[in-house]
């Protein structure tokens, strides 16, 4: 019956066999295309999505919590296993991702690429499939966010496997100052972030010397740079004790820096990021040997940045059409650079602000609301 069907469609037994082979070939191609598409979706999904859809707790951890980890989008197999072992950590990984995303958007708010998110589990879209310096920054700031969130959660007693910092007393701390209190557990936060964030890269298997292997090395390097930024900027904080605030005695502990400082630090590293390439041994080396080799504290990239001026679905660029710009600025936020020479439209908006604020005894400030019509400019 099947033979007759093909004969009917292709006009004869011989042509039927050829037709069957052709259809089979097309079917295989279709399956391969679907497989590649599925793999692309899997590869593009990321644990960053935990920052977009916060993990609910505590009820999800009560009984049979393993399904939770399989339901969380963007996790690799290794990350799902860590989720099953450390389920109470997942909320703070999400917090760290969210902190990293927000800081990325703040640091690039005046740039053509402004760290915009998209409505899927890749979070940043196809632009992250390019090994650019923007991708390097994103990996670093998100890894830093996890260190920050987990270290702080330890200090606040939110996690069952860690507590206050046990960091050694700094050698330069004055003798009469006490080393104690409850510091941020940077050591634990660093180690857990390394285990979790790097898991996705370490479980990938690609041929040595391939582009994919260079991306893995790039991602791991920038993850480490992000973690080290948090570690480098952490400092000693102290509290005074004594009669009438005389500060005759101080208690000190290790404290994380404000995350804005981490963002500023990594933004500087972004501006000076090193362009890399694969050598014959399958290692990343500098493209230009005239510069100092990047350290583990620096960011590295392997691809030039795409054109962020125009919308391009293949690269993930959203373009700058409709972006607000500063008419009087000569910087990246200025209309000339932001709009890529396309010009801009002017429009008026009404802004409401607090004004004429007065302090009243005791103890509050009362303000009026003032409205103002202002000119704004948006790229064509």
Swiss-Prot record:
Tissue specificity, per the record, is: Found primarily in ectoderm with lower levels of expression in mesoderm. Detected in the head and tail with lower expression in the middle of the embryo. No expression was found in the notochord.
| Presence of the UniProt keyword 4Fe-4S in the record | no
Q: Which GO terms describe its biological process?
A: anterior/posterior axis specification, embryo; canonical Wnt signaling pathway; cell fate commitment; cell migration involved in gastrulation; dorsal/ventral axis specification; negative regulation of canonical Wnt signaling pathway; neuron differentiation; positive regulation of transcription by RNA polymerase II
| Annotated GO CC locations | extracellular region; extracellular space; protein-containing complex
List the GO molecular function terms.
Answer: cytokine activity; frizzled binding; Wnt-protein binding
Organism superkingdom: Eukaryota
Q: Where in the cell is it found?
A: Secreted, Extracellular space, Extracellular matrix; Secreted
Q: Where is the lipid attached (O-palmitoleoyl serine)?
A: 244
Q: Which InterPro entries does this entry report, sorted A to Z? A: Wnt, Wnt_C, Wnt_CS
Going by the UniProt annotation, this protein carries glycans at: 114, 120, 312, 326
Keyword entries, A-Z: Developmental protein, Disulfide bond, Extracellular matrix, Glycoprotein, Lipoprotein, Secreted, Signal, Wnt signaling pathway
The intrachain disulfides are 104-115, 154-162, 164-182, 238-252, 240-247, 309-340, 325-335, 339-379, 355-370, 357-367, 362-363
Q: Where is the signal peptide?
A: 1-40
Q: How is it modified after translation?
A: Palmitoleoylation is required for efficient binding to frizzled receptors. Depalmitoleoylation leads to Wnt signaling pathway inhibition.
User: Its family?
Assistant: Belongs to the Wnt family.
> What role is this protein assigned?
Ligand for members of the frizzled family of seven transmembrane receptors. Can activate or inhibit canonical Wnt signaling, depending on receptor context. Plays a role in normal embryonic development.
Q: What is this protein called?
A: Protein Wnt-5a
């Amino acid at each position: 019956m099947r033979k007759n069907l093909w004969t009917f469609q292709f006009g004869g037994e011989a042509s039927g066999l050829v037709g069957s082979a052709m259809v089979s070939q097309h079917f295989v191609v279709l399956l391969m295309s679907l497989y590649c598409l599925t793999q692309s979706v899997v590869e593009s999904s990321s644990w960053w999505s935990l920052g977009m859809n916060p993990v609910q707790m505590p009820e999800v951890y009560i009984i049979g919590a393993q399904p939770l980890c399989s339901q969380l989008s963007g996790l690799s197999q290794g990350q799902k296993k860590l989720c099953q072992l450390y389920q109470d950590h997942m909320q703070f990984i999400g917090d760290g991702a969210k902190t990293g995303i927000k800081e990325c958007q703040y640091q690039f708010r005046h740039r053509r690429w402004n760290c915009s998110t998209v409505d899927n589990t890749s979070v940043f879209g196809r632009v992250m499939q390019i090994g650019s310096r923007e991708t390097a920054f994103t990996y670093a700031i998100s890894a830093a966010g996890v260190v920050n969130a987990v270290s702080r959660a330890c200090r606040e007693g939110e996690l069952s496997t860690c507590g206050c910092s046990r960091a050694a007393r700094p050698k330069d701390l004055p003798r009469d100052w006490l080393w104690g209190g409850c510091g941020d557990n940077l050591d634990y936060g660093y180690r857990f972030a390394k285990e979790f964030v790097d898991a996705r890269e370490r479980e990938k298997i690609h041929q040595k010397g391939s582009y994919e292997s260079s991306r893995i090395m790039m991602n791991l390097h920038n993850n480490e740079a992000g973690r080290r930024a948090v570690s480098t900027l952490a400092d000693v904080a102290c509290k005074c004790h004594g009669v009438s605030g005389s500060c005759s005695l101080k208690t000190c502990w290790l404290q994380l820096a404000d995350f804005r400082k981490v963002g500023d630090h990594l933004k500087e590293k972004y501006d000076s990021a090193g362009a890399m390439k694969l050598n014959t041994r399958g290692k990343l080396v500098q493209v230009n040997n005239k510069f100092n080799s990047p350290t583990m504290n620096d960011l590295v990239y392997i691809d030039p940045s795409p054109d962020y001026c125009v919308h391009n679905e293949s690269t993930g660029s959203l373009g700058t059409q409709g972006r607000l710009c500063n008419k009087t600025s000569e910087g990246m936020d200025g209309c000339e650079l932001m709009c890529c020479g396309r010009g801009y439209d002017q429009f008026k908006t009404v802004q409401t602000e607090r004004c004429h604020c007065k302090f009243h005894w005791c103890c509050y400030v009362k303000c009026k609301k003032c409205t103002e019509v202002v000119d704004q400019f948006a790229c064509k």
